[in-house]
């Protein structure tokens, strides 16, 4: 059984263009994570708050962040993307936050094949409300779990 975590060709991952693996579609409260051993999705939890994911959320294979997990990525798209879908993206920026006293960076990316977002090349070009929704989500989504994010 192939495992996208480590079996994807490294030439498909570069700073300018990469394949993102979607774990969580936008608009849901279920938090899925890929099981590193099996390569399958597992339900981590249902969010405790009434908030839902404001964008498709996943990771960039063959990368590592400070938390020893792959780099997190939010893929802005007009549609929800089915979990475990590979999406060819380009980065437009990064959101930095602190989660459990650790730096937690989220790459903000655009799929090459969504005409609604094709004009955005930099995070500063996003509508302020889009940025505010994403920021708000990450400030509050763990609040009822007793965890603090900055």
Regions found by a protein language model. Give the residues of each.
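Hydrophobic N-terminal alpha-helices or hydrophobic patches in metabolic proteins across all domains
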Residues: 1-150
